[in-house]
Amino acid sequence: MLNQVEKIIDGKVLYDSKRDAFYLKKGSSKQEFNLVSEGIRKMALIWQLVKNGMLEKGAILFWDEPEANINPMYIPIIVDLLLALSRNGVQIFVSTHDYFFSKYVEARKTETDDVLYHSFQKENEQLTIETSKEFALLEKNGILEAARRLYREEIEKLENYQ
């Protein structure tokens, strides 16, 4: 698992107890965390949590938009990491508005993975929650609706060029 995250962060996390600071070590250089991009810093923190044994069976991980500020090419690695953690007994709650992240979860989960999709809607000061084992089966699915809207615009644009 850590090897996959190291591909994203392109290094390892170090902690300097004298300065009470984290660093990202790349080769012979090290950068303070506050100088590292948000996406890389986020992945480095996950790396550190896994390495320190904080994300083991019985742990709970809440992660708001893991795909934010991350190269889209790394989304499959993040999904694989989250599914592996879940299979090892970590309960994971993820919020996302990203079509690709959602579809990668759907594509890579197995029948034995316990993945649920939730859609939260607020209408007239009333919160409604919809839950499904399949992403595409959520009736109120803003992510899919946005993807469909984009698809229709692309088709319309292609038709206008002909």
Language-model regions: role of each:
Residues 64-66:
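Walker B catalytic acidic pair
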Residues 60-62:
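Walker B motif beta-strand of ABC-family P-loop ATPases
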Residues 77-162:
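C-terminal lobe/lid and adjacent interdomain/linker elements of RecA-like ASCE P-loop ATPase modules
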Residues 27, 34, 69, 92-93:
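Short N-terminal micro-motifs specific to bacterial/archaeal maturation
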Residues 1-58, 123-162:
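Phosphate-coordinating catalytic segments in nucleotide- and nucleic-acid-processing enzymes
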Residues 41-44, 76, 80:
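Short, contiguous clusters of charged residues that form electrostatic/catalytic patches at enzyme active sites
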